[in-house]
């Protein structure tokens, strides 16, 4: 091959390569463009400004930027929700703080509830902070506010608790001091000494009982995990609660009557549940006239087990029924002093129920009596896959036989329970089977 032929061949090959490159580029260009665009989008993301705006919008603080003319140039939704800004106008208290901030001071303030804009939520306690936005540009101040309502409520509850405890402990301590003085003054009178010594012992026991209940209530309110969760026989809980107050019932000639053993079971801490039910039994005995009846019944209602304690006592006024589970609340203070009540028993019941994912309810009528119903989740669901194997009726069988079962339950109720159940039934009627929607066919 001559030199000329070699050069000619090289030129042809180069031309072919150029043409092939152009054709390949034309065919691949859409893919390359798409890939480059995708990479550009991935690397671009959101801008820093967009990121900051998003953070400010999502944070729980209310934020607003105001200028020297009181014009709000920036704000987030929380600023309006917490009452800092309304109709682009800064709250008066916040504006006074912002004016000081524009002068170079960092200022803290509180939004006054009475002057909070109507658009803000009620019942809030809002604390704020104003400062200069930039030292180089002193035309703008930034104002932050946050909701501290939970903290304020907690502090108020703590103060009330301390005040209540101080007052309640002062009574037995003062009584023991007076009795001790009387003992010293009657040292030569054996009969008087014996009488006062018995009263000192009563007050000392009352004080010790109150301290123990305070410790128990504090532990329950601490939301600690239940220490000993087991599958518990409800009948054992009932029998142990009655046994704790058998002497008190016998002394007052009060009969504590229960329905037949149920075989029902709950999942929880046996000691706590016995304590809760025993507190209900103790109250029923304490607020019932001598020779009357206190009854205890248990039944399954949905996925919960209900234990009801009914007395034929003095009853609870309607305005007091919402407060009976508060610490130290006692509707009949004179009766409570006579019975030695601490005012903590029902509060303990409430927290025991809550710690078991249950509830406590009350029905009462002055002059008729009261029914307290403790509801605790059952150890096993009501409808199970092995209902047929266990011999238990399936969901629809139980639903179709509901009128007969409810009539039998109604007959076994006390008058107070029957009245309460009638009220509940009238307000909660559902004639459709939860399993089949009313067709009468399970599954």
From Swiss-Prot:
SMART domains: HATPase_c (SM00387), HisKA (SM00388). The chain crosses the membrane at residues 6-26, 46-66. GO terms for cellular component: plasma membrane. Disulfide bonds: none annotated. SUPFAM superfamilies: ATPase domain of HSP90 chaperone/DNA topoisomerase II/histidine kinase, Homodimeric domain of signal transducing histidine kinase. Gene3D superfamilies: 1.10.287.130, Histidine kinase-like ATPase, C-terminal domain (3.30.565.10). PROSITE patterns: HIS_KIN. It catalyses: ATP + protein L-histidine = ADP + protein N-phospho-L-histidine. CDD domains: HisKA. The modification Phosphohistidine is found at residue 167. GO terms for molecular function: ATP binding; phosphoprotein phosphatase activity; phosphorelay sensor kinase activity. Autophosphorylated. It is a multi-pass membrane protein. GO terms for biological process: cellular response to phosphate starvation. Residues 164-380 form the Histidine kinase domain. It is found in: Cell membrane. Keywords: ATP-binding, Cell membrane, Kinase, Membrane, Nucleotide-binding, Phosphoprotein, Transferase, Transmembrane, Transmembrane helix, Two-component regulatory system. Member of the two-component regulatory system SenX3/RegX3. Autophosphorylates, and then transfers the phosphate group to RegX3. PANTHER family: PHOSPHATE REGULON SENSOR PROTEIN PHOR. This is Sensor-like histidine kinase SenX3. The gene is senX3.
